[in-house]
Each structure stands twice: as structure tokens, then as C-alpha cells.
Amino acid sequence: MNNMPTIKHVRAFTVRGGGADYHDQGSGHWIDDHISTPMGRYPEYRQSRQSFGINVLGTLVVEIEASDGTVGFSVTTGGELGCWIVEKHLARFIEGAKVTDIEKIWDQMFNATLYYGRKGIVLNTISGVDLALWDLLAKVRKEPVHALLGGPVRDELTFYATGARPDLAKKMGFIGGKLPLHHGPAEREEGLKKNLELLGEMRQRVGDDFWLMYDCWMSLDVEYATRLANAASEYKLKWIEEALPPDDYWGYAELRRNVPRGMLVTTGEHEATRWGFRMLLEMECCDILQPDVGWCGGITELLKISALADAHGKLVVPHGSSVYSYHFVITRHNSPFSEFLMMAPKADEVVPMFNPMLLDEPVPVNGRMKASALDAPGFGVRLNPECALQRPFPR
């Protein structure tokens, strides 16, 4: 261990348009259609999520260089705010440390930012640093990240697809399809009727054995979510996802008691750290946890979240995040399948989530991915040199 390199530099960049901020898409993309959101109570912000600024956060690229010249990197969301946090605050805990000091660095970053952090943009940033550290260490050791996490427990990953066309996802070999909920409580009975009509139409198209789920993106209240779940049981809705605001643990516990027997309640995309997920688990808020590894605290924290979930008999199915979640899921028994975000504008083909920003990003084939597709050192991806990185706060 004494010959392990130290960390020489950490640098933070952003990039304009798309990248890791997958909401930053052009017009006509399904992800910016009329989708139910917490802002749906305001008619002027109902038609497009970009209208209220869902795409303003931007991409954060964290690059960490070791004393032997090895470079690890990651991409997440955070933009210029994340760059400022890395360069002005977190760099002091990273530079000069050993590449193996991942746990210590995480602890220092989290505790040093408690007075203005805990969740949100700060945890996105800490997650980005953490992922870059895992990428760096794995490259130094010339191993894939999943080898550092204990190695694969299965030969392949199995995926469900998130997008506007579950019927097409079935033809592509996915085990299920998760639809965005289009109409929230502010659109009243007519909106609820349209939600159920779409679900019924998709059930007709895909048959009885294909999973269908609704992603509600924090936009409902307990009453509406309960009504939706009960009515949707006719169409064999497998789960209702992120129905309530992430801080409403009490509401989630009530909703889980209310939904029809056999239907699952899932959440956690916008939760962070082991302490947030501890609340979800101990209050019996959900059946599946869905942390985003680029937002919840990185791999270091996701390992703790997963252990907590396993002790409570719950599954962990990370939100999106491509290779950053694939390397984790392949090593965990309580993560039996993965999410794949359909980033084609019409959700009609399989394209890499971070295209064109990352090169060598693997994608499912017929809804599956061999473990061997993840065997390159680190997370196995490269930054596209054609993406113009900007470093707003150089030191």
C-alpha cells in the first residue's frame, strides 16, 4: 500500500447542453412533454418542465489526477455551482490524499459541508467527487469498479425501460416499462381519467406479463396517489413511483398502507445519504429504494444505503445513472434488476444515457447486459474530446 500514488490535482468542469443533465434536451423530446410535477399547480408551468427551469442545473465533470498520471473522472449534475464547491471547498480534502483514502475523504467532505449541505447540490457534488475517486482507484489497480465492490454476483444485468413507449420497450426485450405520469391533482378528474386511459391503452398493447409502472416525480398528494393506485390496479400497475415530495415520510407511510395488495410503492430518487434512507426504511415508506448514485452520496454512501435496505429486507434499484449504477447493481443480491432511461427523443431506440458526452458507454441488448461488458478499468468510459469543457473556477 505504501507505493500507492497520491492525489495531485482535482478539477471541476461544466459543459453546455445535455451531458449529464439529461433533462436539458431539445424541443420534442418525451422527457419534456406535459408531465406531472410539483409545479403543475401553476398552469403557466404545466406544459413543459423546462418552463420552470428543470434544465438549468447543468453538468458537473469532476477530474482527479494521481501522482503517477492516472486520471479518474465522473459526470453528474451540478453545473457551475458544483464546480465552485469542488474548487473552493472540497479540493483541500482531496489533493495530497492517497488514492485509497476514499472513506476518509467522503467523511471530511460531508462533515465540512454540513452547515450548508446535507442534501441537494452539495450531495450531487460530493457524489461526483466520490465517483471520480472510485474510477481513479480502479484505474490505478487496473480493475473495473465492480471488482473493488466484491465482484459480480450474477452473469448479466436485466433492465426495465423508462420512457414514453413501454410498448416499444417490450419489443426491445426489456422486462417492463415505466411511464411518466402526465396529469397531476391540479388537472382534477379529467387528468386522472387521462392517466388511467393511457395506462389501459399500454396494458392492451403489452399484454398481462409485462411490467407497467408510473413515475409521478414528487407531484401528488396522498389522496390523489391513493385514488390513482386503486384505479390503476385494474391495469396491473406494478408500482407507483415517487408519488409524494421526498420529505413527506409520513405521507409515504400512509400511501404504502393504502395501495392495493401486491402493488409496490417506490421512492428515493431525490433522497440522499444513509440518514435519509434510514427514515424511509424505519417508517416503512416504500418497498423499493431508488437512490441515484450521482446524487445520494456516490458509491461510498450507496454501499451503506444498500446494507441498511438489505437488513430491512428491501430492494435497491438505483435511479438511472448508467455505468455508475451498473457497476454497483452487478455486485448486490438485493439489486436484482436495473433501470434504463430511454434517451432517444421518441423513446423508440436504445441510445447511451450520456451520449454524446461519454465514449464506450455500454447499453442493454435485448434488455440485458453481460457482466463482461463492464470489465474495462474504472467505470470503463471516456470523456468525448469533442465536448467543450469549461472550468469556471481554475486555481
UniProtKB/Swiss-Prot annotation:
Binding site residues for Mg(2+): D215, E241, E269
Give the reactions, separated by semicolons, that this protein catalyses: L-rhamnonate = 2-dehydro-3-deoxy-L-rhamnonate + H2O
Q: Keywords on this record?
A: Lyase, Magnesium, Metal-binding
- Which terms in the Gene Ontology molecular function aspect does this entry carry? L-rhamnonate dehydratase activity; magnesium ion binding
Q: Does the keyword rRNA-binding apply?
A: no
Cofactor: binding comment: Binds 1 Mg(2+) ion per subunit.
Q: Which SMART domains match?
A: MR_MLE (SM00922)
Active site location:
H319
Q: Which PROSITE patterns match?
A: MR_MLE_1
Q: What are the required cofactors?
A: Mg(2+)
InterPro entries in the record: Enolase-like_C_sf, Enolase-like_N, Enolase_C-like, L-Rhamnon_dehydrat, Mandel_Rmase/mucon_lact_enz_CS, Mandelate_racemase_C, Mandelate_racemase_N_dom, RHMD-like
> Site positions for Increases basicity of active site His, renumbered to this chain?
D292
Report residues binding substrate.
H23, R49, E339
Q: Which HAMAP family match?
A: Rhamnon_dehydrat (MF_01288)
Q: How does it assemble?
A: Homooctamer; tetramer of dimers.
Extra remark beyond the main annotation:
Reaction proceeds via a syn dehydration.
> Which NCBIfam families has this protein been placed in?
PRK15440.1
Q: Which family does it belong to?
A: Belongs to the mandelate racemase/muconate lactonizing enzyme family. RhamD subfamily.
Q: What job does the chain carry out?
A: Catalyzes the dehydration of L-rhamnonate to 2-keto-3-deoxy-L-rhamnonate (KDR).
Identify this protein by name: L-rhamnonate dehydratase
Q: Which organism is it from?
A: Polaromonas sp. (strain JS666 / ATCC BAA-500)
Question: What lineage is this protein's organism placed in?
Answer: Bacteria, Pseudomonadati, Pseudomonadota, Betaproteobacteria, Burkholderiales
